[in-house]
Amino acid sequence: MVVSARAGIVVTGTEILTGRVRDRNGPWLADRLLELGVKLAHITICGDCPADIEAQLRFMAEAGVDLIVTSGGLGPTADDMTVEVVARFCNREMVLDVELENKIAAILNSLMTRFNPGDFEAVRAANRKQAMIPAGSQVLDPIGTAPGLVVPGKPTVMVLPGPPSELQPMWRRAVMTAATREAIADRTIYRQQTLRMFGLSESGLAETLRDAQASIPGFDALEITTCLRRGEIEMVTRYEPDVVNVYVELTQLLRDRHGHQLYSEDGARVDDLIAHLLAGRRIATAESCTAGLLAARLTERPGSSDYVAGALVAYSNEAKVTLLGVDPALIAEHGEVSEPVVEAMAAGALQRFDVDTAAAISGIAGPGGGTAEKPIGTVCFTVMLADGGPTLTRTLRLPGNRSDIRERSTTVAMHLLRHALSDTDSVP
């Protein structure tokens, strides 16, 4: 039986434990470990109390993990105690790394010269703590002022900074250290594939997977995780290379049953696809209930200025009339949440921004404003192309609270854009 190397993650920080700051390191580290073929046994979040951090390290060690990855607690302040705790856990003396101290001093001097001239020696003394490391550990040069460390042992402990902008660039160097390579030497090499679906319920996918388990030999060799994210289903499958034929058979079954909903077999997100489809085009958005969320999503990608011309948030009826040229008679006859009005909003965006592509959204996100005819969650969408392409208009009833409805509306609009620009027959 093949036994893969096992790892645990300890995310530190009282602000994360209490929910004031979202944990961005734990999920990211989990994905990186899985990519390496290392089995993730545990992930915990604890506050800045040294006793609690040490308790988590001991729990991981008693669980038999080969590698522990920590994040946070590497700063110069009194509550940054992770390094001291790790040294005690690993039975190693704390020593001053003079070379590291000089590197940190150079970084501080550069920062102070540019932003905050002051008493450099006082700041240097305050940051000397960051150059104190467990004897025998390998230093990972800082991205900010906090160095990372890899402390060899059973288990090996990888100590990384808390800010994701510092942790993520440090990861590759941490993995390449001799201590880390030795700790994960027994890893199993996996392939990982991501499928994305839109317009399919989780229960519908679950039924297909049950049928696959009953009909595809070797199905249980696949490790499948499904997640509902932004109104879409993300299905991640990990498998050893010798069972690739099982994954191929599963993918074919999903194509046969859910070909209209399966929009990505290589992990590409709808945002990536739309960026490609908008090459050579110009788009503008007109939004009411989403208040600019669609425009924000379209501009999340670097380089989006090549195809995004602008956006209008026409929240009130007056704004729809004055900014987008919507006929007041349409609003009076059909209401602001209606297909005729949302089509007029899209047409107004085409004209106002002189573009060839427009998307418009108007809806009732709640918690008030719903009626028997148009309950909360009623949202109208239009994607309009000025160069003879299809105009797609839909009215949907979306579930959830105000935030859910607004986010799902944005996702629906993205997929309507995808369909209009790719001119596919299967429109949600």
Swiss-Prot record:
<dbReference type="Pfam" id="PF02464">
    <property type="entry name" value="CinA"/>
</dbReference>
<dbReference type="Pfam" id="PF00994">
    <property type="entry name" value="MoCF_biosynth"/>
</dbReference>
<dbReference type="InterPro" id="IPR036653">
    <property type="entry name" value="CinA-like_C"/>
</dbReference>
<protein>
    <recommendedName>
        <fullName>CinA-like protein</fullName>
    </recommendedName>
</protein>
<dbReference type="InterPro" id="IPR050101">
    <property type="entry name" value="CinA"/>
</dbReference>
<dbReference type="InterPro" id="IPR036425">
    <property type="entry name" value="MoaB/Mog-like_dom_sf"/>
</dbReference>
<dbReference type="InterPro" id="IPR001453">
    <property type="entry name" value="MoaB/Mog_dom"/>
</dbReference>
<dbReference type="InterPro" id="IPR008136">
    <property type="entry name" value="CinA_C"/>
</dbReference>
<dbReference type="InterPro" id="IPR008135">
    <property type="entry name" value="Competence-induced_CinA"/>
</dbReference>
<comment type="similarity">
    <text>Belongs to the CinA family.</text>
</comment>
